[in-house]
């Protein structure tokens, strides 16, 4: 009797502890917030500055997996990974302070707008003696960044644990996915691939639930259920992988004398050694 009482007591403790997720759930309207950073964001921003920034073009850094989200309700046309990876890469290049990204993803829109400006100026200045002010030429890139999200593997590790005794019990489960990003640096002068970097990032999902189903008295049934699930945002995982790839590109570029950093040799040696440890 004492043993069963202790087990019920422990089960109730687990239930009440799990209820913390319920009582702390967001029930009010949340304000918009600026984008979350990742551990790789801090590391990327703390790199030594370059001696001269590099003009870089990114035409398309896309999802190459072709995978869709799994669904139990038939067809699902939502992709498994984000389709905005080009924007994420450009933001990472800006944050590094090593590169000057130029608009290439929607180049047709830029060229069309410049044509509109030229035609408008010619139309309104043709009857005047003033000279037509020419548009400044577009920047051209010394290097291009190519690649994309090449792999998304779901359920690479799954598992769980559960126990139940006299109607009281709890269980937990987890799942691990993985996303892989490839990034390559291409010279626009001769088309040579100067450097290729690939980074993999795991994505963790966890769930915990507990329940109690027990007759506490004649015709008196106690039934309690609680639980919560925690999923790592896939977009943040992709962001971290891309930022880590940019960081690796910069460090290996310094190591191979592709570009030069404006920092003492001791600092560069420390950065390179720390990178090689990973």
Question: Which residues does each PLM region occupy?
Answer:
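C-terminal motif of bacterial Sec signal peptides marking the signal peptidase cleavage site
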Residues: 15-18
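C-terminal/domain-edge helix-coil "capping" segments
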Residues: 20-52, 153, 160-161, 172-278
């Amino acid at each position: 009797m004492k043993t069963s009482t202790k087990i019920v007591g422990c089960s109730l403790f687990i239930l009440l502890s799990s209820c913390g997720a319920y009582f702390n759930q967001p029930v009010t309207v949340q304000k918009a917030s600026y984008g979350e950073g990742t551990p790789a964001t801090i590391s990327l921003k703390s790199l030594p500055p370059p001696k001269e920034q590099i003009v870089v073009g990114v035409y398309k850094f896309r999802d190459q997996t072709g995978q869709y989200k799994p669904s139990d309700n038939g067809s699902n046309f939502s992709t498994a990974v984000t389709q905005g990876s080009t924007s994420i890469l450009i933001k990472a290049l800006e944050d590094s302070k090593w590169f000057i990204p130029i608009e290439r993803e929607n180049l047709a829109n830029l060229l069309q707008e410049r044509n509109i400006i030229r035609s408008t100026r010619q139309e309104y200045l043709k009857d005047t003696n003033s000279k037509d002010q020419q548009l400044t030429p577009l920047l051209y890139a010394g290097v291009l960044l190519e690649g994309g999200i090449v792999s998304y593997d779901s359920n690479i590790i799954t598992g769980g644990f559960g126990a139940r005794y006299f109607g009281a019990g709890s269980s937990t489960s987890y799942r691990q996915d993985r996303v892989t990003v490839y990034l390559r640096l291409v010279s626009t002068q001769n088309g040579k691939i100067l450097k290729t970097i690939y980074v993999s990032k795991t994505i963790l999902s966890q769930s915990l639930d507990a329940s109690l189903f027990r007759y506490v008295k004649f015709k008196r049934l106690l039934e309690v259920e609680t639980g919560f699930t925690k999923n790592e945002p896939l977009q943040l995982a992709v962001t971290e992988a891309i930022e880590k790839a940019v960081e690796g590109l910069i460090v290996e570029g310094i190591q191979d004398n592709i570009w030069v950093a404006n920092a003492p040799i001791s600092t560069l040696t420390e950065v390179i050694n720390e990178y090689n440890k990973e």
